[in-house]
UniProtKB/Swiss-Prot annotation:
This is DNA mismatch repair protein MutL. GO terms for biological process: mismatch repair. InterPro entries: DNA_mismatch_repair_CS (IPR014762), DNA_mismatch_repair_MutL (IPR020667), DNA_mismatch_S5_2-like (IPR013507), HATPase_C_sf (IPR036890), MutL/Mlh/PMS (IPR002099), MutL/Mlh/Pms-like (IPR038973), MutL_C (IPR014790), MutL_C_dimsub (IPR042120). Keywords: DNA damage, DNA repair. The gene is mutL. It comes from Streptococcus pyogenes serotype M49 (strain NZ131). One of its GO terms (cellular component) is mismatch repair complex. PROSITE patterns: DNA_MISMATCH_REPAIR_1.
Length: 660
């Protein structure tokens, strides 16, 4: 009696489904990729209950014949490869013939299809992989596949599904990646009757990016291009000032296929070099065209892992393309951006000259109990026509018209403000240990901060500053040197910690509301976690496509910090995912105190410096910044006398010590 048996085909398909169909988003990916392979120009994805109840993909592609339709549910039956040589030169997204049989084995599937060569189409209905109906019907050219009751016969898989909003976010992400990979295809995603994504299918990658990430984001992205004998690299990368808290916005495409590759991600970051702050990542869409012989996609069932020959050469090509593109830009933030309505000045980069330290005009306002920067006059006259000419305005209007969908309503600038994300206002050397993804370090830091006791601060008399960074003061214990950034960071941390801890119903109405734009998946995730934002006094309302509107702000948040502060909180919420209100508030206080504090090379006037020391003296722990760095150091009178050899231990003379 033999112990080895051949498994039934349906059971084999269900086993394969364990690898191919991880969640509803996997079904959407496989069906849409099949539609793209069928040379479709329009693809519509409709889902109900995040795909668990129903997924329907409709395309206008080539369709299937009546004879081929039942074969599509047979395992390893495909029209995309026919010989071993085809396996090493794959030009389609699918090729194994596993996806459709795997999906059919764990759901009820209905397929309507027709080719342009025949006058009628075909209908197939199967449940659990078993064909129940196969008949001729009237249907337009193309294919419509409906998947219902997903995982109905594999209840164990249902237990591992996340919330409906989380599963929907995965589906949106899949459709967005495929839209970027194939801008020539018009994609539409509809969830429970609500349209979430729509692209025009014009073939313009920049327009596809605008449809997914928003117009404001697209305006701050640069085109890149590079090529050698084996690779062609093109796409768009964001300016260093436009970053996100994770790598989810870095999209790498190889021959129209979205892939995950650690080394290529590393090459992208290398192209930016030191222009990115630590823990921040750019928005990138890079399209790589390569000879299929140099890429092996037959590595993983999801086909997202691809082995690439000459990978090091490709890395160098990507890094060079990004670095060269950034070199051509003036990366200094434009102070006249709001007036000129232009995000970047496209000037040739001038030769850099070392300038002496000069005062930045930082002053203290005793009424607001805060510092402010006094605007300084521009020393060099800039021709007014460079910024305000009609040519500039006209070009910007044309750019907006090209990127905005025709159906989108343009909101007047007087009714709302479009919030911009925070720029990189401190470098990676400021706080290399500040990384919200390192939960253990953050937890230890928060525990230490909670256990701080009130300290007694010495009475100091300020008398000077060095290099716009260190303050000098004297006290009865000698000379004190204070790090002005660390000092104000401690002051601001305790301010934000107390104010955020006092969150209640005290809100300030905004005369002009703010609009906040997000990607589709982030928009859905934030809707699910909105209660956490409400806890800290942030109430965002849905306002159009992937956009929230803020009509009021908490009183602890200064009005000039609304745009950057709300984006920072949303990024933190998306990154940490499961976070307690207590930890959320503490992390926010640490982050905002660091970003809102004065930096090095800011010269303070005497009044501002003295008030900073007064504020520091009132802190619970004035000796360390929230990250543990010392705020001040002390040289006692005895230390000074020893350094100048005014006193010697045991009164030993210099001659006795052999110095003379």
């Amino acid at each position: 009696m033999t112990n080895i048996i051949e498994l039934p085909e349906v059971l084999a398909n269900q086993i394969a489904a364990g690898e191919v169909v991880e969640r509803p988003a996997s079904v959407v990916k496989e069906l849409v990729e099949n539609a793209i392979d069928a040379k479709s120009s329009q693809i519509t994805v409709e889902i109900e209950e995040s795909g668990l109840k129903m997924i329907q993909v409709t395309d206008n592609g080539e369709g299937m014949s009546h004879e081929d339709l039942p074969l599509s549910l047979r395992r390893h039956a495909t029209s995309k490869i026919k010989s071993q040589s085809d396996l090493f030169r794959i030009r389609t997204l699918g090729f194994r013939g596993e996806a459709l049989p795997s999906v059919a084995s764990i759901s009820k599937i209905t397929i309507k299809t027709a080719t342009k060569e025949v006058t009628h189409g075909s209908l197939l209905i199967a449940t659990g992989g078993e064909i129940e109906t196969l008949e001729a019907i009237s249907t337009p050219t193309g294919t419509k596949i409906k998947v219902e009751n997903l995982f109905y016969n594999t209840p164990a898989r249902l237990k591992y599904m996340k919330s409906l909003q989380a599963e929907l976010a995965h589906i949106v992400d899949v459709v967005n990646r495929l839209s970027l990979a194939h801008p020539e295809v018009a994609f539409t995603l509809i969830s429970d009757g609500r349209q979430l994504t729509q692209t025009s299918g014009t073939g313009d990658l920049r327009q596809a990016i605008a449809g997914i990430y928003g117009l404001n984001t697209t305006k701050k992205m640069l085109a890149i291009s590079n090529a050698d004998l084996d690779f062609e690299v093109s796409g768009y990368v964001s300016l260093p000032e436009l970053t996100r808290a994770n790598r989810n916005y870095m999209t790498i495409l190889v021959n129209g296929r979205y892939i995950k590759n650690f080394l290529l991600n590393r090459a992208i970051l290398d192209g930016y070099g030191s222009k990115l702050m630590v823990g921040r990542f750019p928005i990138v869409v890079i399209d790589i065209q390569i000879d299929p012989y140099l890429a092996d996609v037959n590595v993983h069932p999801t086909k997202q892992e691809v082995r690439i020959s000459k990978e090091r050469e490709l890395m160098a090509l990507i890094s060079t393309a990004i670095s060269e593109s950034l070199k051509e830009q003036d990366l200094i933030p434009d102070a006249l951006e709001n007036l000129a309505k232009s995000s970047t000045r496209h000037f040739s980069k001038p030769e850099q000259t070392q300038l002496p330290l000069q005062s930045r005009g930082l002053y203290y306002d005793p009424q607001k109990n805060d510092f402010f920067v006094k605007e300084s006059a521009v020393s060099e006259k800039i021709p007014e026509t460079d910024f305000y000419s009609g040519a500039v305005d006209n070009s910007i209007k044309v750019e907006k018209a090209e990127l905005l969908p025709h159906s989108e309503e343009v909101i007047g600038p007087s009714s709302v403000k479009h919030a911009s994300r925070p720029q990189n206002i401190f470098t990676e050397t400021d706080h290399p240990n500040l990384d919200l993804k390192n939960r253990q370090k953050l937890s230890q830091m928060l525990t230490r901060l909670e256990n701080e006791e009130k300290s007694v601060f010495p009475e100091l008399d300020y008398f000077g500053q060095m290099h716009g960074t260190y303050l000098f003061a004297q006290g009865k214990d000698g000379l004190f040197i204070i790090d002005q950034h660390a000092a104000q960071e401690r002051v601001k941390y305790e301010y934000y910690r107390d104010k955020i801890g006092e969150v209640d119903s005290s809100l300030q109405q905004l005369l002009v509301p703010y609009l906040f734009e997000f990607s589709g998946s982030d928009f859905i995730n934030l809707q699910e976690k909105m209660a956490l934002l409400n806890e800290v006094g942030i109430f965002l309302e849905v306002y159009g496509h992937n956009t929230f509107i803020l009509r009021e702000h908490p009183i602890w948040m200064k009005e000039e910090e609304i745009a950057s502060g709300v984006y920072e909180m949303c990024d933190m919420l998306l990154l940490t995912n499961e976070v307690s209100i207590k930890t959320y508030r503490a992390e926010l206080a640490i982050m905002m105190s660091c970003k809102r504090s004065i930096k090095a090379n800011h010269s303070l006037d005497d009044y501002s410096a003295r008030n900073l020391l007064l504020q520091l003296a009132q802190c619970q722990n004035p000796y360390n910044c929230p990250h543990g760095r010392p705020v001040l150091i002390n040289f006692s009178k005895a230390d000074m006398e020893k350094m100048f050899r005014r006193i010697q231990e045991n009164h030993t003379s210099l001659r006795e010590l052999g110095k003379y």
